[in-house]
Amino acid sequence: GEITIGQMRQLVSLKVSNAESLEGLQYAINLESLDISYNEIRDLSPLKNLKKLTDLKANPLGGLISGRVYAEDNKAKVSLDVINRNGEKLLPKSVIVKHNKTHEYNTLDINDCIDENGVVTIDTTGFDSYIYPIYLVYEDKVDNYTSQFMFMLDNI
């Protein structure tokens, strides 16, 4: 059956798996311990008002974002909303491009590729005609976790 708000209020400890959203957990007002490690969760804001939540395990989070990114005029743009527990959008800490043919990883200079809104622009000038995995890495120092999300850049 369905879980009631009353049942949510009884939760003290919870381990979550195979989740993409924390929606509904805002009703677990007595939650003290939560383990959401290894999930594809991008928004932790439903936890914002859980005052008793002192044990949060969220390291790491991440996954593959469906769909492909295509370059236009030698520029590929990627925007992803990763929201921390306080409802604040996190900016990527690093952007890594992998060449699928050579298996080389290239970490881009954050200052050159991210604007103030967190939109990542990758200059594809000089890229081979190939598929490139793009890794966006986020870090929340307050709750001590990192998130890594992967996009596929289609430069064919």
Where do the PLM segments sit?
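Conserved hydrophobic beta-strand positions in leucine-rich repeat
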Residues: 11-16, 32-36, 56-59
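Conserved hydrophobic position(s) of the canonical leucine-rich repeat
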Residues: 11, 31, 50-53, 64
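Short beta-strand elements
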Residues: 141-156
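Hydrophobic anchor residues at the C-terminal helix/turn of individual leucine-rich repeat
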Residues: 5, 25-28, 47-50
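Canonical position 11/12 of the leucine-rich repeat
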Residues: 18-22, 39-44, 61-65
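Acidic, glycine-rich calcium-binding repeat modules characteristic of RTX/beta-roll
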Residues: 35-48, 53-57
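Solvent-exposed, low-complexity, repeat-rich "mucin-like" stalks and linkers
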Residues: 61-101
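LRR flanking "cap" motifs
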Residues: 1-24, 92-94, 99-128, 134
